[in-house]
From Swiss-Prot:
Its cofactor is pyridoxal 5'-phosphate. Belongs to the class-V pyridoxal-phosphate-dependent aminotransferase family. NifS/IscS subfamily. Gene3D superfamilies: Aspartate Aminotransferase, domain 1, Type I PLP-dependent aspartate aminotransferase-like (Major domain). It comes from Helicobacter pylori (strain J99 / ATCC 700824). This is Cysteine desulfurase IscS. GO terms for biological process: [2Fe-2S] cluster assembly; cysteine metabolic process. Its EC number is 2.8.1.7. Transmembrane segments: none annotated. The modification N6-(pyridoxal phosphate)lysine is found at residue 206. Keywords: 2Fe-2S, Cytoplasm, Iron, Iron-sulfur, Metal-binding, Pyridoxal phosphate, Transferase.
Amino acid sequence: MLQRIYLDNNATTRIDPKVKEIMDPFLRDHYGNPSSLHQFGTETHPAIAEALDKLYKGINARDIDDVIITSCATESNNWVLKGVYFDECLKKGKNHIITTVAEHPAVRSTCNFLESLGVEVTYLPINEHGSITADQVKEAITEKTALVSVMWANNETGLIFPIEEIGAICKEKGVLFHTDAVQAIGKIPVDVLKANVDFLSFSAHKFHGPKGIGGLYIRSGVGLTPLFHGGEHMNGRRSGTLNVPYIVGMGEAMKLAVEHLDYEKEVVGKLRDKLEEALLKIPDVMVVGDRVHRVPNTTLISVRGIEGEAMLWDLNRSNIAASTGSACASEDLEANPVMVAIGASKELAHTAIRLSLSRFNTEAEIDKTIEVFSQAAVRLRNISSSY
């Protein structure tokens, strides 16, 4: 069987064997409902508490109760935006939300929905580097602004947004601040207190944990109307039977992610740079976005004259997994939205390929990818009508 190379880690990651190992007893033996009063339920409580401890420490939250378990970051993002709509827009008349054009569809689409309910949403444009400035946020805030929602790191370019500066502005202005940290956790340090964040969304499967489990940090003292009703789970904030094995797995994945931050920077970052430098030797290849202020595992490459989907399938035939952008929208085959937002032509925006590494990738895999990608570029350009 040919070697398979996985370079789509911004879409999802393989589960760490240590995570799988710690989850296994709760799938086989300790399967009781944590809300039950008998021993099958109560024996799960220490493991849940330990997992929550790992989670809140991993993002430097103030208290273990500040982290609420959800099914994924999409739920967390929806909860924040819709909860703020109920708490701030309807009850207090603060009918304005600020976000960016570069957000994940889980934020953008929810904002579109809120617009249909009468909420005014400002979508801040990104500059030619793929980022925004804190001053843009400051200038957009009005007396009616209820929430600012800006991702910590972009899922396509890997660009890191100025979260600490934005957090300071929001604190000064008395505006709630939410960040989608899905692409930041496990790649760079995330500190909710230092960043003055009120809400932070994350998802375990993006840092080598299981799919179907995520979390929402809610700063102590900040209220948020529940999205789900029907139980008193998570101190009455999020109804639904606790998914014990996945909570345990997510906690361990967070612990391992924090422990590997230096490895991400020193080893994964160097592998990404090696891949990038080799591909830039191909004529008419460019890296999209700022190459300095970004997470260490991600590169968004544009190969002029080659449709991103064509390159994607050519790589796939060689057992190399990559992406043309967000996996949540990859079946749409639309032009890369970040490239469109920075002003690239629609034709050029269709040429984007995202390569995202993890701590499980090897140098041999990168060497093989360079070889296959370079050969594919020549072959596809020979049959391209636009090059």
